[in-house]
Amino acid sequence: MPPNITALNTTRARTYVFRLPLFTRVVIIAIVGFWLAGLQSIVDIQQWGALIPDEMGLATLYRMNTFPFIHLNIFHAVMNILALTPLMERFEAEYGTLNCLALFFGPLTTIPAFLYIGLEKFVFGNNVAVMGASMWVFLLLGVEAVKTYKVNPNFVIGTYSIPTWTTPIGVLFAMAVLVPSSSFWGHAAGLVIGYGGMFSSTLNKKEKRQCADVKGVAGLGYVKFLAPPEKILRWIEGKLNLLGRLPHYVSIDQKTYGRFGVLPSNNTPAAASPGVALGLVGSTQRLGP
């Protein structure tokens, strides 16, 4: 029996990896590639691509897009890959590959990077460099926590009812205690932007009023404004025939709940429940011509 269980787990893991969507695969490959590039001694990859507040200028703005791919060592890279992969593949399956490309090489990386630089340089007066995909991890944890809050607002511990959207905050402080060398403010910047991108778009008017005292920046719901126009994405997909050319590509018509993470209503049939739908994450099914 144990060998069969081991074989089953291995098969499921292999199937999961083979079904990862395109952008998620590219991110993983890039992280591994930058780690391999850092093994040579000619160019200091960490110094070249890390997010260093005092090194930022017009000529070094590229750091805002390179720092998530660069890691201190193989352990750092592997841990971030394991944490990031399930979160990124869910996001890509819902929003689409082109959306992920535009958002993660744009506002979902640069906004938390600017926020971190502002805090580190102008508030604390420090120059602590950060690198690694953990900022993305906390950003996506914020996104997932808010979506979970919509379905299950609270969980109970003893006699205390705790809002589910606060779970990543607990993870944030636990990480700061367990890994003191990690960047608390870098993680916090990602988490704030993750909350801000989803909170407003997943709450109804009554819930928005109830949460007005805690949502802060989250009320912006800026994903609707930062995501590329759907007409442009459809035009690019059709013009370049991305569905026909790129395996594991996730198109606009392939996403689970629609463009901005609209969750099913209470009247949605059981077959369309969140648990069932997430089982399709990473599917390579192609729709259209």
From Swiss-Prot:
List of catalytic residues: S134 (nucleophile), H187
Pfam families registered for this protein in UniProt: Rhomboid
Alphabetical UniProt keywords: Golgi apparatus, Hydrolase, Membrane, Protease, Serine protease, Transmembrane, Transmembrane helix
Compartment list: Golgi apparatus membrane; Golgi apparatus, cis-Golgi network membrane
Gene Ontology CC terms: Golgi membrane
Spans traversing the lipid bilayer: 26-46, 67-87, 100-120, 122-142, 157-179, 184-203
Keyword Secreted set for record: no
Catalytic function, reaction form: Cleaves type-1 transmembrane domains using a catalytic dyad composed of serine and histidine that are contributed by different transmembrane domains
Protein name: Rhomboid-type serine protease 2
E.C. designation(s): 3.4.21.105
Function, in words: Probable rhomboid-type serine protease that catalyzes intramembrane proteolysis.
Gene Ontology biological process: proteolysis
Annotated family: Belongs to the peptidase S54 family.
One example GO MF annotation: serine-type endopeptidase activity
Species this protein is from: Podospora anserina (Pleurage anserina)
Recorded superkingdom: Eukaryota
Membrane topology: Multi-pass membrane protein
